[in-house]
Amino acid sequence: MRKTLIVSIIFLFLLTSCTQQDVVKNQPKELLYVWLHDIGFEDPNFLAVINADSESENYGELVDTIPVFETVGMAHHTPIFLPSSGLIYANDFHNSHTYIYETSDPLKPKLSKSFGKIKEYSFPHSYSELPNGNIISTFQTKGGINTVGGLVEFTSEGKYLRSADAEILEEPVFLRPYGIVLVPKLNRIITTNYDMHETENSYHIQIWDMKTLEKLHTIRLPKTKDKIIDQNPFEGRLLSDGETVLFQTFSCGLYMLNSLDQNMPKISYVHHFAEGPFCSLPVRLDNFWIQTVASDKGGFNGVVVLDITDPANPTEVDRLDTGEDYGTHWLSPNK
C-alpha cells in the first residue's frame, strides 16, 4: 500500500459462515475475519474475529483477537476468498513473514504455522488457492530488495512444494510479482507487477502454465495517448466466461486480457477510472466491476461501478463518493 493513501490502517478481511453444528444459541451465523496492525507499527499484528451476523444482538462486536509474536509489522494481504481448507494465509510485509491461521472452530481461530523467507524468496504478497487445494503465492524479491522474485507453491498446510522465477534473463525488465489471477479452464496463472517498496514503476504482466509453473509470456501494457495509466498492473479478476481477465493498474487504467491459450495473448485498454487517484482492490460481481479509488491530492475518493457485460466497452453505471477524508483500498466478496 502506498504511504500516501489516506487510509492509515491496513485491514484485510474474509467472511465465513459457521457450519450448522457450530451454531448454537447466541452465537453468530456469520463472522468477519480482519487482519490488521496498530497505527504505529509497534505492537504485534493480529487477526480479529467480528460478529457479522446482522440478525444477532451483538452484531458488529469483537469476538476474539489472535496476535502473532513479531512486532513492528505490517499486516497486509490475505487470500481474496477463504480457502476450502479453512486455513487463512496472512502476510506481514515489513517482516517478510507468512502466518497461517486454522479456523476449524470459526469463533476461536488458532495460529498454526509461520515462516519467513523460502528458498531465498522474500516479501510475500498475494495468496490464492489452486484447483487441487494447494496455495500459490507471489514473492516480490529473491535474495535481496533489488532482485526479482517469483511464484511459490505450498500445500494447504504451508509445506513448500516448488517455485519459479519471474526474472527475464534476456532483457532488463523491472518486475515485482504482486497480484494473482487463476484461469483453470485454460491452465493459466496471471501475475501482475507492483513494487511495494516503490523503487520503480512496473509495466508488465506475466502468464504462467498452472501445471508446470513455466513462465510463458511477459507482456508490456499498451501505452495510452495523453494518459499515464499503464504504470503498475495491480489486481485482476477472471470474468464469467472463465477465459477473459480484466485487471486495473494502480494508476487507474482498466485493461482486458484475452486469447490466453494462444501464442500471442492480447491486452487492450478499455477504461480510465479517474485522474490522479490510486485504484486498488476491485470486486467482480456477475457482470459488474466494483473499483476502489483513493486520492491524497483532493481528487475523487470512493467506489466506481462498471457494467462489464461487454468487457471491451465497459460502462460506468454508478459511483459512491466517500469524501475527502476516506480513501477506499480493499473490497472482498462475501463467499
Predicted regions and their residues:
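Blade-loop segments of beta-propeller domains
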Residues: 59-129
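Residue position within the beta-strands of beta-propeller blades
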Residues: 34, 90, 137-138, 191, ...
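Beta-rich, blade/repeat-based domains predominating
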Residues: 69-83, 118-131, 169-187, 223-244, ...
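Short loop/turn segments immediately following beta-strands, especially the blade-tip
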Residues: 49-58, 100-109, 157-159, 207-216, ...
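Beta-propeller domains
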Residues: 180-304
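Short glycine/acidic-enriched loop and turn motifs that connect beta-strands
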Residues: 38-41, 94-97, 141-145, 195-199, ...
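Asp-box/WD-like beta-propeller blade repeats and closely related beta-sheet repeat scaffolds
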Residues: 106-184, 193-195
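Beta-propeller fold detector
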Residues: 58-68, 110-117, 161-168, 215-222, ...
